[in-house]
Amino acid sequence: MNLKLLRVTLAAYAVAFMLVLSCEPLQAQDSRKSGFDFMSSATQTLQKDDSQNPAMLWANDGRAVWSQPGGAAKKSCANCHGDINRMRGVAARYPQYSTAAKRVINLGQQINQCRVSQQQATAWPAESASLLGLETAIAIESRGLPLAPPSQPQRIEAQKRGETLFNQRIGQMDLSCRDCHESLASKRLGGNTIPQAHPTGYPTYRLEWQGVGSLQRRLRGCMTAVRAEPYPYGANELVDLEAYLAKRAAGMKVESPGVRP
């Protein structure tokens, strides 16, 4: 092969190579995984089959509460919102800024806000069966939809504060959320695999709890585990953390109610 032909051949290969590169997608592969992906097949089966998922007991109670008149106003959720299937997409947007509360709130807090202002009833306590049941029933309506935290200025500020908390070392063990759920994700701890901490399945039935619990309950449990003083339920710091976790998991599919070890 003479020199001129060699140059032409190499040039043709170079052009072909550049064309191939230009056709390849430039998107980075999404390495995020739901906690579901780290579970045993037996626990996964519990979550996937509604006839076996124990959280459905709470969801069924929540659907009943949806239609029950409550408080001095004798109003039900259905009186204002219609059928519960109209809640599709709602859970995927929380936490979000509430003009009534003048702060960022989670779904459970929104339920209690409606209960007080619309039903003229007493707010349900955190982790109460009625609150968790209704929250679970509403969350189910968003199954399969991507988490979609809204771009509200107040919410963005909350998630920034939450990111700071996520990276902050706390407790006698001097650990941060990031240390476990990013640096050590997929490693083993106490017989279980450390997940990436994406809140796609809350409210969740935890086998450890033998019941359904909120994301705030899980966050408080983590704080206790690293020997730190947990924030009280409803604290702005917990909501800020929830806001950051939702942003971190944006686009991942809602799978409520989850089942976890």
What would you call each of these model-derived segments?
Residues 86-90, 187-191:
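Short Cys/His-rich "knuckle" micro-motifs
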Residues 73-84, 134, 162, 172-184, ...:
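The canonical Cys-X-X-Cys-His
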Residues 66, 165-166:
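Conserved short C-terminal alpha-helix that flanks the catalytic cleft of nucleotide-sugar-dependent
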Residues 2-59, 95-160, 186, 208-230, ...:
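Post-cleavage N-terminal segment of exported redox proteins
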Residues 50-81:
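N-terminal, post-signal-peptide region of Sec/Tat-exported proteins
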Residues 92-101, 193-202:
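Short cysteine/histidine-rich metal-coordination sites, predominantly Zn2+-binding motifs
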Residues 164, 171, 179-187, 198-207, ...:
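C-terminal cap of thioredoxin/glutaredoxin-like
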Residues 69-70, 169-171:
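Short coil/turn linking the two alpha-helices of tandem helical-hairpin repeats
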